[in-house]
Amino acid sequence: MRKIRTKICGITTPEDASAAVAAGADAVGLVFFQGSSRAVDIARAKKITAALPPFVSVVALFVNESAQNIRRILAEVPIHIIQFHGDEDDTFCRQFDRPYIKAIRVQTASDIRNAADRFPDAQALLFDAYHPSEYGGTGHRFDWTLLAEYSGKPWVLAGGLTPENVGEAVRITGAEAVDVSGGVEASKGKKDPAKVAAFIATANRLSR
């Protein structure tokens, strides 16, 4: 039996974190990119993580952040995995003594094909929609058929996912992990518990 892993990203409150966990999320994402409407600071991140039970992974999302600031956050917030969404290379990403996931903004099949060679130390790759000026969380999707035959490094599907289309996305791509943010929101930075529950329930139905 395969389990479709789910991450709810862009969590901004302890209440939203608790709702995600209650619905069955495997991981929650905290955005430390101040250019995002879903950004959190250290104080808020500590409140969110304090509300989580054991065995739920906390993922910190960074975009072209300095190594100094990343280390400062890691020293104060219990982070299990780092997710890099900017222009970071493998040498930069691997230096923080945490497993890391690298987001790949997909335009063509070559973006997918070359990703594993570019980031050999990544625990996984996250395939997201390309946007010329935004780094994730855009609500846009890419051509899922580009992933239909992919069999490289472990990977996560993101980009424009919703409770309504995640089933189709998994069937087309064969994804075993999915990441959603805007697709389960009531408004920017505020999750809709019903949408979160519906998204995870659909993923769970495919876990068989």
Swiss-Prot record:
Stored PANTHER family: N-(5'-PHOSPHORIBOSYL)ANTHRANILATE ISOMERASE (PTHR42894:SF1)
Record keywords, A-Z: Amino-acid biosynthesis, Aromatic amino acid biosynthesis, Isomerase, Tryptophan biosynthesis
Name of the protein in its database record: N-(5'-phosphoribosyl)anthranilate isomerase
Record InterPro entries: Aldolase_TIM (IPR013785), PRAI_dom (IPR001240), RibuloseP-bd_barrel (IPR011060), TrpF_fam (IPR044643)
GO MF term set: phosphoribosylanthranilate isomerase activity
Residues in coiled coil: none
CDD domains the record matches: PRAI (cd00405)
Class of the enzyme per the UniProt entry, highest EC level: isomerase
Pathway where this protein functions: Amino-acid biosynthesis; L-tryptophan biosynthesis; L-tryptophan from chorismate: step 3/5
Family of the protein in this entry: Belongs to the TrpF family.
EC number assigned by the record: 5.3.1.24
Catalysed reactions, semicolon-separated: N-(5-phospho-beta-D-ribosyl)anthranilate = 1-(2-carboxyphenylamino)-1-deoxy-D-ribulose 5-phosphate
Biological processes per GO annotation: L-tryptophan biosynthetic process
